[in-house]
Amino acid sequence: MAPNYAKKCPVMGKAPSSGHSSIGPQDVHTLEVLSNFNREKIPERVVHALGAGAYGEFEVTHDISDICNIDMLLGVGKKTSLVTRFSTTGLERGSSEGVQDLKGMATKLFTSDGEWDWVFLNFPFFFIRDPVKFPDMIHSQRRDPQTNRLNPNNFWEFVTENHESIHMVLLQYSDFGRMFTWRTLSSYSGHAFKWVMPDGSFKYVHFFLSSDRGPNFKDGAGTIMDSSEPDFASRDLFEAIERGDHPSWTANVQVIDPKDAPHLGFNILDVTKHWNLGTYPQGVEKIPSRPFGKLTLNRNVKDYFSEVEQLAFSPSHLVPGIEASEDPILQARLFAYPDAQRYRLGRTLSKQASPRTSSTAEYQASLGKDFAEWVAQVSSDVWSQPHEDDYKFAREYYEILPEFRSQEFQDRMVERIVESVSQTRQDIRNKVYRTFALVSSELATRVQEGVEGAEIGQEKNVQARL
């Protein structure tokens, strides 16, 4: 017997059109088969379209009850089931997982208080701090609407007109921006969140997952991908779990008292900056982290479409004890993610009612004028404009690389930038040189000499063939 898609009664075989001379309303089974086929696929995600996923669990490993009132995180040894989806960002399904861009690691935790989504990226900061720029930023990294090919002119024009993105660009073009495997990917919330106590007091937190295996690059070896296998990371993840080699991540949290937030030397609500773990920049207070749990993936999915492709993540999926901060990019994501899922999955998308925590408004009012003025910065006219910190963070990242990693690590970053900028128009190149000069004269010179030197070399090769 063949299945009946209406789930009302079985159908004897798949006889052609049930013996009728034409397909009409009476031929219910054929119409159901065709209508089901027409609906097998759904629109792909507008970002993070290419992905892989697996099931697992989260276990609390350290007591953090002094700063946290989230039930899932209270009690060492408490376990919570979860599903995680890894993804690239800009390109479509079918593209290579090794593309040099942001990678996503989104986790849905099935807590006793509801679903809590951790929508993380593999970098601790982002390109922009003004959400109105997000569509232009994504479009600049996608295929050109005329040629349907990647166009470096679009990307570098965006960078040179939005200097807050330089910090992120340098990280993306380094080995950190290359794919290793999903199992060695660390990921970060990026945004500040609020962990709220029963009395309404709160701490600003940034939490992240450190891979217990990675990063696994050494002298660039880990950045070499087999272009003939675009899904190499998905295969690696699936096969590792199948053989019992379960990948795991340590969950860590950085904590800031709101009274201290206005005096840190940078604004933690600016997602183009990272919370200093002690590496860089100088003059910015170190914000140490503390571990609190372990995430382990231990079971593969059976049906990718229903179990991974139809997952709907959003940073608005919260549980009691956590609230979103005033970060403008985070605030925009609270709307954009559910809206994108409604478009992608339709009206049948289950509506998740996120329980509200106790209000922090009264507590915030008690923090005084300095705090109020600090929060108000995110809605000021100058928030979106470039300022010295945009160049400072990028400059110190560039300068610390030889010590933090190696000279070769820094060299490879410059080489990749040169390779990309070499594919742009001369007017764009000149803007790139001027932009990098605001960060480091050495960096600007290396990029310019690399690009123009390659151009001269190509011209000589052409002349030699004539």
Swiss-Prot record:
GO terms for molecular function: catalase activity; heme binding; metal ion binding. Heme binds at residue 337. Its EC number is 1.11.-.-. GO terms for biological process: hydrogen peroxide catabolic process; indole alkaloid biosynthetic process; response to hydrogen peroxide. Its cofactor is heme. Signal peptide: none annotated. Transmembrane segments: none annotated. InterPro entries: Catalase, Catalase_AS, Catalase_clade1/3, Catalase_core, Catalase_haem_BS, Catalase_sf. It holds the Pfam family Catalase. Pathway: Alkaloid biosynthesis; ergot alkaloid biosynthesis. One of its GO terms (cellular component) is peroxisome. The active site is at 48. SMART domains: Catalase. Residues 1-22 are annotated as: Disordered. Keywords: Alkaloid metabolism, Heme, Hydrogen peroxide, Iron, Metal-binding, Oxidoreductase, Peroxidase. It is an enzyme of class 1 (oxidoreductase). PROSITE patterns: CATALASE_1, CATALASE_2, CATALASE_3. Catalase; part of the gene cluster that mediates the biosynthesis of isofumigaclavines, fungal ergot alkaloids. The tryptophan dimethylallyltransferase ifgA catalyzes the first step of ergot alkaloid biosynthesis by condensing dimethylallyl diphosphate (DMAP) and tryptophan to form 4-dimethylallyl-L-tryptophan. The second step is catalyzed by the methyltransferase ifgB that methylates 4-dimethylallyl-L-tryptophan in the presence of S-adenosyl-L-methionine, resulting in the formation of N-methyl-dimethylallyl-L-tryptophan. Belongs to the catalase family. This is Catalase ifgD.
